[in-house]
Amino acid sequence: MRFDGREKNALREIEVTPDYLMHPEGSVLIASGNTKVICSASVETKVPPFMRGEGRGWISAEYSMLPRATNTRNIRESSKGKVTGRTMEIQRLIGRALRAVVDLDALGERTIWLDCDVIQADGGTRTASITGAFIAMVMAIAKLDEEVPFTKFPVKDFLAATSVGVLEEGGTVLDLNYVEDSAAQVDMNIIMTGSGAFVELQGTGEEATFSETELAELIALGKKGISELIEIQKETLGDKITARIKGE
């Protein structure tokens, strides 16, 4: 039993509020325990310069955190005049993950921007951002589909992410909060599709190593958590959109 009462294979309580913002084509507030992220999807009828004239679309992401999303205030990156390496890494991760499940040819020559804004952080902000951004992105694409139906729905599969880790006294665990993440001997982020394919594995030992057996346990925990997250995504999006993703 962990200090917050969860079993080792339990996600934190997940709540998804769709249409959280009035202006974007798609938006959600996703809460993973005390971590809360607003994810919005905006559609632009243009693509980056390197893709012009190809007839293909693009998915890109931006990530930020409110100054007091954390225990102590952080200076806004706009005040610093530059984006930190961590932020750049997370933005690229979100965009790369989402592009893995989108047929960019079917999307057509348009860009979908995903903005992930952390309003409260308690560990797992990047994985919550990916899980929430997927929902917002699909909502935006579904609106395009209602206006002019796609011959082939661009979203090929569901996608979600979670964290797993190894604690000194708790062994392998699913969905680490900040306290656990700070003390973890091993921390890993897992991104998977609804069909069970891996998009990304990011695992690191912190002054520690991990065995092949522990790696297998971590992956099994991640698969369980992602399966549960994808069910929540399906419930949020509804049967009609879920059927479009399945090609029905």
Curated annotation (Swiss-Prot):
Enzyme class: transferase
Membrane-spanning ranges: none
Record-listed phosphate binding positions: 86, 124-126
Gene3D superfamilies the UniProt entry points to: GHMP Kinase, N-terminal domain
Database matches in Pfam families: RNase_PH, RNase_PH_C
InterPro entries to which the protein is assigned, alphabetical: ExoRNase_PH_dom1, ExoRNase_PH_dom2, ExoRNase_PH_dom2_sf, PNPase/RNase_PH_dom_sf, Ribosomal_Su5_D2-typ_SF, RNase_PH, RNase_PH_bac-type, RNase_PH_CS
Molecular-function GO terms, alphabetical: 3'-5'-RNA exonuclease activity; tRNA binding; tRNA nucleotidyltransferase activity
CDD domains (UniProt xref): RNase_PH_bact
EC number of this enzyme: 2.7.7.56
Keywords for this protein: Nucleotidyltransferase, RNA-binding, rRNA processing, Transferase, tRNA processing, tRNA-binding
GO terms, biological process: rRNA catabolic process; rRNA processing; tRNA processing
Family: Belongs to the RNase PH family.
Role this protein plays: Phosphorolytic 3'-5' exoribonuclease that plays an important role in tRNA 3'-end maturation. Removes nucleotide residues following the 3'-CCA terminus of tRNAs; can also add nucleotides to the ends of RNA molecules by using nucleoside diphosphates as substrates, but this may not be physiologically important. Probably plays a role in initiation of 16S rRNA degradation (leading to ribosome degradation) during starvation.
Self-association and partners: Homohexameric ring arranged as a trimer of dimers.
Record protein name field: Ribonuclease PH
Species: Listeria innocua serovar 6a (strain ATCC BAA-680 / CLIP 11262)
